[in-house]
Amino acid sequence: MASPSTDRLHLIEYLQDPGNPDGESRERLIEACQDVIASLERPIETARKQAFLTLDHAVIRSAIKLNLFKALDKEDRPYSTQELALATTPQCNHVLLSRLLRYLATRPLRLVIETSAGFWQRTARGSVFAQDSFKSGCSMYFDACGPAFQALPTWICTPDHERLHSPFQVAYPGQGSFFKRLQEDDSMLQTFQCWMETVSRHQFCAQETIDFNEWIPDGTSDSDVVFVDVGGGTGDQAIALGYKRIGLPGRIINQDLLPISQEAEEMLRSHNIERITYNFFDEQPLKGACVYHYRQIFHDWPDADCERILRRAKDSMTASSTLLIDEVVLPETGAHWMNDHKYNGVACYST
């Protein structure tokens, strides 16, 4: 890991000769910028920034709910406040909308630009939230997880013998777990699945560097189960393997408890992938498969539940089966921003 001083030198070099940095260099530049900002901030600026983070999220969620970013994204030109008020769905009072737009234009949000008095234009950052794939994350965390985040201080300061299983239970009394609530709210479930698909597309995938076919022996028949993606959501990993096994024998199975959209089911069928409703805490109905695959499942569950899931996998395996776990592992020190997910787990899933 590069030192902060090295990253700052890298930033100076970049400012002198801007280019198109690769992935690692880009992350180092962002970290260097953040270090510089942190070193320049006055205490009152730090306090104000943190105090308004919740409002930032609420304003962005309001704009998403009004379809404001989609309205701005139709054409790359300035729009008047009155024009946008008519274009939002539902239509918004132009005075309230003007206040919302002014907030979205402030630093560090910069999600719109005020080109002149009462006229607004999209930015590249704001256009991100015109896309369903990206706006789903903001919507899900605000609507579903936000109350659990708000309950975290109360939960964590409660004595051990009085503390409920998770902050989610403080925020949603009597509603069980986060995943149980998803099953009972179709709109939230669709938003969650859309966000999971988006995250999956932008995260490291083991299949990019490992050929899963290594664990599938030659001589398999059409009836043999060669790959079971347990808790596989809408099936992106099963589909990725399906592309590599076109014309080869064997059944590829996608398992999950949560229902998926008709479009996702049709996508699986078009790739000859079977979909089975399955709770990974129950006995695995598919015995002796070549590969049982778990991608980013275990960080959502406490240790005891992870052991239960693994026991079910072990009981279904034979000597020729392989267990593949694709998971996020955090170092004790110097953790990446993915550490945020750890506290997301504490708040919503009690991991």
Curated annotation (Swiss-Prot):
GO terms for biological process: methylation; secondary metabolite biosynthetic process. SUPFAM superfamilies: S-adenosyl-L-methionine-dependent methyltransferases, Winged helix' DNA-binding domain. InterPro entries: COMT-like, O_MeTrfase_dom, Plant_O-MeTrfase_dimerisation, SAM-dependent_MTases_sf, WH-like_DNA-bd_sf, WH_DNA-bd_sf. Keywords: Methyltransferase, S-adenosyl-L-methionine, Transferase. The active site is at H299 (proton acceptor). The keyword Disulfide bond does not apply. Pathway: Secondary metabolite biosynthesis. Apicidin F, like the other known apicidins, is a cyclic tetrapeptides with anti-malarial properties via histone deacetylase inhibitory activity. Its EC number is 2.1.1.-. GO terms for molecular function: O-methyltransferase activity; protein dimerization activity. Disruption phenotype: Leads to the loss of apicidin F production. S-adenosyl-L-methionine binds at G231, G232, N279, F280, R295. The keyword Methyltransferase applies. Pfam families: Dimerisation, Methyltransf_2. Induction: Expression is positively regulated by the apicidin F cluster-specific transcription factor apf2 that binds to the eight-base-pair motif 5'-TGACGTGA-3' called the 'Api-box' that is found in all promoters of the apicidin F cluster except in the promoter region of apf2 itself. O-methyltransferase; part of the gene cluster that mediates the biosynthesis of the cyclic tetrapeptide apicidin F (APF). The non-ribosomal peptide synthetase apf1 incorporates four different amino acids to produce apicidin F: L-phenylalanine, D-pipecolic acid (D-pip), N-methoxy-L-tryptophan and L-2-aminooctanedioic acid. L-Phenylalanine is the only proteinogenic amino acid directly used by apf1. The 3 other apf1 substrates are non-proteinogenic and have to be modified by other enzymes of the cluster. Belongs to the class I-like SAM-binding methyltransferase superfamily. Cation-independent O-methyltransferase family. This is O-methyltransferase apf6. It comes from Gibberella fujikuroi (strain CBS 195.34 / IMI 58289 / NRRL A-6831).
